[in-house]
Every structure is written in structure tokens, then in C-alpha cells.
């Protein structure tokens, strides 16, 4: 699986939701994306659906941390990454954060057959 990046502006925050493998060129593209964004917005990076992060991805996360980002990590892998890299975690997604493909309002996506 490749990297999927979704952004949403909500309540004075830019939420950047990552899904898949946060590696190489995809990670560098996220670095470019966040540096072009309005720095008046709080930056929140949701790592919950990230399955793998390579050294470049870790470097980008540390860069984003230096910009003042906070991180959402709801899985054991994403929590481990936040702990290991000492990324400030805010716990769960904001309740009114839109989750594309959401069918039940609780972040559960319909199964694909």
C-alpha cells in the first residue's frame, strides 16, 4: 500500500491524516505540504492508519514536531512511533473530525469485498 494523505481544516487546526506506508518520496511530499500551509493553524498529524515508517519518514515526523505539530496515535504501532520519537500525542481524533468513507460516525469504514 502506498501513502494516502488527507487534509482538513477544522476549528483553527489543519488536520493531516496519513494512511499506509510513510516512506521516501511520500514522506518528503508531506514535508513540502506542511511547509506551504498557513502557519497560523495548529497542525495535527494523525498517524493512526500508518502501517510502516522508514528513516526518511521518521526524519519528516521530527521536522513536523519542530514546527509545533501534535500527533494522533490510536494504534499500538502509531503509539510506539510517538513514544520512540517523543512526538507530542493528543490521543484520539477530535470527535467532529470527518473521516472519509465513514459509515457510522465512529471512524469505522465499510468493509471492501
Regions inferred by a protein language model and the residue ranges of each:
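STAS-like cytosolic regulatory interaction modules
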Residues: 1-113
Amino acid at each position: 500500500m502506498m501513502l494516502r494523505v488527507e487534509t482538513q481544516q477544522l476549528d483553527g487546526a489543519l488536520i493531516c491524516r496519513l494512511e499506509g506506508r510513510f516512506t521516501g518520496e511520500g514522506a518528503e511530499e508531506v514535508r513540502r505540504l506542511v511547509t506551504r500551509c498557513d502557519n497560523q493553524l495548529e497542525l495535527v498529524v494523525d498517524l493512526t492508519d500508518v502501517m510502516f515508517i522508514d528513516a526518511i519518514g521518521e526524519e519528516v515526523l521530527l521536522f513536523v514536531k519542530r514546527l509545533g505539530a501534535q500527533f494522533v496515535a490510536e494504534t499500538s504501532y502509531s503509539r510506539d512511533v510517538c513514544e520512540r520519537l517523543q512526538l507530542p500525542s493528543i490521543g484520539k481524533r477530535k470527535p467532529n473530525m470527518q473521516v472519509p468513507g465513514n459509515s457510522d460516525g465512529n471512524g469505522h469504514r465499510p468493509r471492501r469485498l
